[in-house]
Amino acid sequence: PCDWSSDVCSSDLVSIGMVGTSLSGVTFVSVPGMVRSIDMTYMQTVLGFFFGYILIAKVLLPLYYKLQLTSIYSYLDDRIGQHSYKTGASFFLLSKIVGAAARLYLVVLILQHYVFAYWNISFAVTVVISIFLVWLYTYRGGIKTIIWTDTLQALCLVAMLIVIIWQVKDKMQLDFAGMVQTLQASQHFRIFEFGDWHSTQHFMKQFFSGIFITIVMTGLDQDMMQKNLSCKSLKDAQKNMYTYGFAFTPVNFLFLSLGVLLLTLASQQQ
């Protein structure tokens, strides 16, 4: 899957790893939680994501490979100038540092509370150890290690999503067919909104928002695109983008379905 003598990885591995990058523990709360207020209309945005990935594969990836970029922000240097390059790269670093720090803080806090506190290890030591481990595996393995860990994260998150849905199904005393019928019968099983143009959930608004969100958050994001640039060729990178977009759609559908099932379970227990 990965050539460890270089920065080259297979497109299938990269696409799974990108799913892992897009998902997190926050996804388990935020996406199912949307169902209560907007039903399953978020799927309209997800469909826009898919077409956004196609545009990235057809427009941005050929450009990046043609210029043989290792950093997508160097394109700003070529087209606009050094100041735009530094500005784009600086905002990327700032956003990633803040986001990574918040996630790391949450993980370290949990480890400290449930594990290291019993060994009388201070919080500062836990932080230093965690940062050192992150630095060690990225420094020794580079982009290949990042892709492998993202892939493992994706598999674990999707597996846990399926397990949670199955546990909720059993809690509701349903078989698989009964679960599907429950989803279809729910008032929250509303995916498309075509009637009210003034609604923020109107299909056209959500669909095109999804396209532009994908272009900005994936196509112009170094963290995501460096994984595509690790593929052997442009064709492999495009295949990865198509696979990633295709896989991301059913995963979001499962998260929204979980939200419907949880709302149904909550109403039954009131």
Locate each region found by the language model.
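Small-residue-rich segments of transmembrane alpha-helices in multi-pass membrane proteins
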Residues: 13-18, 79-88, 153-166
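Single conserved hydrophobic/aromatic residue that forms the stacking wall/gate
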Residues: 1-8
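Helix-loop-helix module between adjacent transmembrane segments
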Residues: 19-20, 43-139, 209-214
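Hydrophobic, membrane-embedded alpha-helices of multi-pass small-molecule transporters
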Residues: 9, 13-29, 130, 141, ...
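Membrane-embedded alpha-helical core segments of multi-pass
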Residues: 27, 52-59, 68-69, 129, ...
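Transmembrane helix-boundary motif of multi-pass solute transporters/channels
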Residues: 12-48, 109
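Short amphipathic alpha-helical coupling elements at transmembrane boundaries
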Residues: 74-82, 89, 145, 181, ...
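Hydrophobic alpha-helical segments and their helix-loop junctions in multi-pass secondary transporters
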Residues: 97-104, 108-125, 139, 152-192, ...
